[in-house]
Amino acid sequence: MNGTEGPYFYVPMVNTTGIVRSPYEYPQYYLVSPAAYACLGAYMFFLILVGFPVNFLTLYVTIEHKKLRTPLNYILLNLAVADLFMVFGGFTTTIYTSMHGYFVLGRLGCNLEGYFATLGGEIGLWSLVVLAVERWLVVCKPISNFRFTENHAIMGLVFTWIMANACAAPPLLGWSRYIPEGMQCSCGVDYYTRAEGFNNESFVIYMFICHFCIPLVVVFFCYGRLLCAVKEAAAAQQESETTQRAEREVTRMVVILVIGFLVCWTPYASVAWYIFSNQGSEFGPLFMTIPAFFAKSSSIYNPMIYICMNKQFRHCMITTLCCGKNPFEEEEGASTTASKTEASSVSSSSVSPA
């Protein structure tokens, strides 16, 4: 094994020189330089500096503007709540631990940080799945006369929390475990060892299939069908400039959605699976640290993609920030009107993500 396994930790360095110490008790500067921990803390500070305001603003603007309190926006709010879980449950903790160079909060802190970071990420992930399914049902109409109601939205919210806890809670209950990973300043699921009594192998397989592959297939299917529906509508109304513009906008939205999903989650899932499949192989502390925190940066990607592309929300957000006035009101109003015209040619609901 090209690492050192101890009680509830795995350090990616062979202890031939005797310098490896518990990441709960000693600084891990033998893994990377103190400057690397400073960079990690600075990156977490950046994510908090951007992620907290944009997600908090999402909640505040939706509460303030009644017209935004639609069933679909319940899911978008759930996405913002998930991102705030990651900000407060993961990023703030990592700033503190990176300042010390090790996971100074101990085993209990590791369990809490791992749980809340995983929970936030999974709520966000399954919220994206619910959004994709909603768009497919409303725009493509596989079920005739389907209308996304408040009850459907509530069911979607419950579903996201059930699925998120189905992934985040088992390591607290003995099926796998949370341990410090990478630079040993944040905690995640144990992909690294086959420690007796934790059944890490079965949990990692379950997590990879049910909490990565299946969501990926669903998102690709739903947005692929959505794109086909828009193309068909545009082909049937080739003389309509607004319909052609709708096709381009939705195409761009779908591309960004899929890329955002892949950029956030594929590196982390791929590296985790590689480590799991090649246990004992040599890898450095940055090998898992970089993709792990790249996935957590979805707290910034999500609101930018799913909310800031919503013209109506953008108008309300500007109005809130500018004390009740929108200096771009004419432009935003014309854009919103055009959006509604475009959307009506494809479905009785909207094509845009809200």
Swiss-Prot record:
Which compartment or compartments is the protein found in?
Membrane; Cell projection, Cilium, Photoreceptor outer segment
What PTMs does it carry? Phosphorylated on some or all of the serine and threonine residues present in the C-terminal region. Contains one covalently linked retinal chromophore.
Q: What is its main location?
A: membrane
Alphabetical keyword list: Cell projection, Chromophore, Disulfide bond, G-protein coupled receptor, Glycoprotein, Lipoprotein, Membrane, Palmitate, Phosphoprotein, Photoreceptor protein, Receptor, Retinal protein, Sensory transduction, Transducer, Transmembrane, Transmembrane helix, Vision
Q: Which residues carry this modification: N6-(retinylidene)lysine?
A: K296
Residue spans of biased composition, Low complexity class: 334-354
- Where does the record place the region Disordered? 333-354
Q: List the signal peptide residues.
A: none
Query: Lipid link (S-palmitoyl cysteine) located at?
Result: C322, C323
Membrane topology annotation: Multi-pass membrane protein
Any one cellular-component term (Gene Ontology): photoreceptor disc membrane
Q: Which Pfam families match?
A: 7tm_1 (PF00001), Rhodopsin_N (PF10413)
Please provide, alphabetically and separated by semicolons, the GO molecular function terms listed in this UniProt record.
11-cis retinal binding; G protein-coupled photoreceptor activity
Q: Which PROSITE patterns match?
A: G_PROTEIN_RECEP_F1_1 (PS00237), G_PROTEIN_RECEP_F1_2 (PS50262), OPSIN (PS00238)
* Recorded family membership: Belongs to the G-protein coupled receptor 1 family. Opsin subfamily.
- What is the protein's given name? Rhodopsin
Name the species this protein comes from: Gambusia affinis
Gene for this chain: rho
